[in-house]
Amino acid sequence: MAKLDANSEFEKGRALSVPVVKVPRSVKEWLCIDRAYENGNFKIEPMTGEAMYDQSYMFEDINYVNKDTAKKDSTLLEIMTLLKSLDGPFKITLANEQRDLDSFVNEIFNPINGQEYPVIEKGIGKWINQKIDEGTRDIRKTMILTVTCRAHSLEEAEAYFATIDTTLSNIFRNLRSRIYKMSAEERMVLLSRMLRAGEECLPPARISPHDSGWKNQILPASIQSDTDYMVINNKQYISVLVGTAFGQSLSEDKVIHSLSDVLFPTYITIDMQRVPKNVIHDRLENAHANNERV
């Protein structure tokens, strides 16, 4: 027998978080983070009692870099499959970040050993020039996992994330990879890099859950919005695309690879929400009975 409320129960899994400010009146109010703690935990929603908290981790995924194209396409999906063992919602962000050219050259081409290894120095110099000509010099890939939970206090959220740390370590060990828990400073630098592409990004001087002044230190001076794009600091244009349904002919791994293998800054976020088995069963039962549109 079909369940009349199957669709509504299924859609509850896609509920949005409560914004800190319903209608932002300044750039500072635009960032939906209620409180930040030095250990890297962020309180996302403003209410007292049960609220949303999250924690971010960075992939130190050497294997991903070294894989061929076919393997790269499937690695992200393999990780997502394993992470389905987590109880709460999570998201994976694949960031193509713009970096400063001088920093890139200093990192790759260190002239200290130039006199000792002149042939190697010359070869690296040619390689750098080749990369500059190709236009790939200022893009780097970063993979971020953000885990979310609902808790009545910071202590309750920290206890949950402590168990998650062990689970994630085991998952990535099986993938022959590593994962690194990010501090508040590191998360803020990441946010700043996204909003101030190509500029030097420094962590806030002071981080306190009772002081939101850190937002002014990482956010741009101005954000203007138009119909289908935003302008940051009158020079950086941002467009946001949201995909909620995909044709069966599309291959997930190829879509992800195509969107991420580009020569300009992009941030691809894949949101995952666990749905109870009984809700999925009712939803499929209704679809089979053709009583609801799916």
What are these regions, as identified by a protein language model?
Residues 1-294:
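Extended, folded cores of ATP/NTP-driven motor/assembly subunits in large transport
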